[in-house]
Amino acid sequence: MKIPNRQKFTKNHKRNLITKETRKTGLVLGNYGIKATETGYLKMKQMERIKGDLVKKLKDNMDIYFNFYPLFGLTNKGTARMGAGKGEVSEWYVLVKKGSIVVEFIKSRMTAGAMQKVIRYSANKWPIKVRMTQIKQGLYEKKI
């Protein structure tokens, strides 16, 4: 994954974990998706591991679209005396809110049962709880 090239402020305060997503709650591009059921942080290493596992399991059966991008920097000061500043950005993370669609699967050539197995396998790698969502003929979203 890429890191942000340029930001106005790279050293941010930590975000509020109580909020709930109101905008990205439905599937837009694909038939299947992974929805977050709790709020939490995803670090860049965790994102890479999840992406690699999904690509390995799905192979060429469908395209994967990730709805997140690491925008916030996590700083690490190290060992220094007081008053030396905040520290440099050591890694990047993204805030995933409860109810947001995190991953969408496009052009699916798999059944719902096979897709559930893949998502259950990858759900163990996530630092937050996730579940699978499915859209039926573009009309409504079904919880699985």
Curated annotation (Swiss-Prot):
UniProt keyword annotation of Ribonucleoprotein present: yes
Coiled-coil regions listed in the entry: none
GO cellular component, one term: mitochondrial large ribosomal subunit
MF term (GO), any: structural constituent of ribosome
Pfam families reported for this sequence: Ribosomal_L16 (PF00252)
PROSITE patterns recorded: RIBOSOMAL_L16_2
InterPro entries assigned: Ribosomal_uL16, Ribosomal_uL16_bact-type, Ribosomal_uL16_CS, Ribosomal_uL16_dom, Ribosomal_uL16_sf
Gene Ontology biological-process entries: mitochondrial translation
Family affiliation: Belongs to the universal ribosomal protein uL16 family.
Protein name: Large ribosomal subunit protein uL16m
Species per Swiss-Prot/TrEMBL record: Dictyostelium discoideum (Social amoeba)
Name of the encoding gene: mrpl16
